[in-house]
Amino acid sequence: MYPSLDDDFVSDLFCFDQSNGAELDDYTQFGVNLQTDQEDTFPDFVSYGVNLQQEPDEVFSIGASQLDLSSYNGVLSLEPEQVGQQDCEVVQEEEVEINSGSSGGAVKEEQEHLDDDCSRKRARTGSCSRGGGTKACRERLRREKLNERFMDLSSVLEPGRTPKTDKPAILDDAIRILNQLRDEALKLEETNQKLLEEIKSLKAEKNELREEKLVLKADKEKTEQQLKSMTAPSSGFIPHIPAAFNHNKMAVYPSYGYMPMWHYMPQSVRDTSRDQELRPPAA
């Protein structure tokens, strides 16, 4: 009579090592047929849709290399070049051991770091200089560019002095200079408005003076025409012969021509202080 087979015993039967045929003889005494040359070794698992047959030409790809299971000896070694490049130039060595005697296999990964302080200290690498890399590299490049912009701002604010490295001091200087420039711009704008108003008033005065000049010029031409018409003699004009006058008469106003005039009375005659004696009033 055969012994009873529990679930653990059956699972151990299914997880046998095919490379060692000696284990098959241990279970033949119980009447269990475990021949591997049959077409369907596990009919119970096939009914559940599980395929446990190994394809001879099946090739798996791990990273940049390909693994041929037909010639696989159980140990997989990865070269350091196949491991992704790390920020701190970490050389990784991974060793994967697959045990075919177990159901899922065991995977073992070993990593060796050349620099233990790499995770704590951020060193300058070549990947950061090319603009790529991790978030730490991008953040470092951003800070470097920001520091350069602050240095340029400090040199622009104070050209003759050494650029400052204190960012709050640079920002304070920039705010102060901007406020000063804003006040100067407002003052210049007010001055410009005043000058524009003065220019408008001067233009109005200029137009008024131009009109007055035209009026005066017209009056001058009119006066000249009148003078020319008064002084110009007519074609049939005969000069008047002055009348005879006494030689002791002289002209008072030369412009009036020589007209007979009496001499001035002497001072003794014009004295009226003794008129009562010399010339008594008529009775």
Swiss-Prot record:
Keywords: DNA-binding, Nucleus, Transcription, Transcription regulation
GO molecular function, one term: DNA-binding transcription factor activity
Principal cellular location given in the protein's record: nucleus
Annotated region (Disordered), positions in chain: 96-134
Biased composition (Basic and acidic residues): 107-120
Alphabetical GO biological process terms: cellular response to glucose stimulus; intracellular iron ion homeostasis; regulation of DNA-templated transcription
Segments forming domain bHLH: 130-181
Protein name per its UniProtKB record: Transcription factor bHLH104
Gene behind the chain: BHLH104
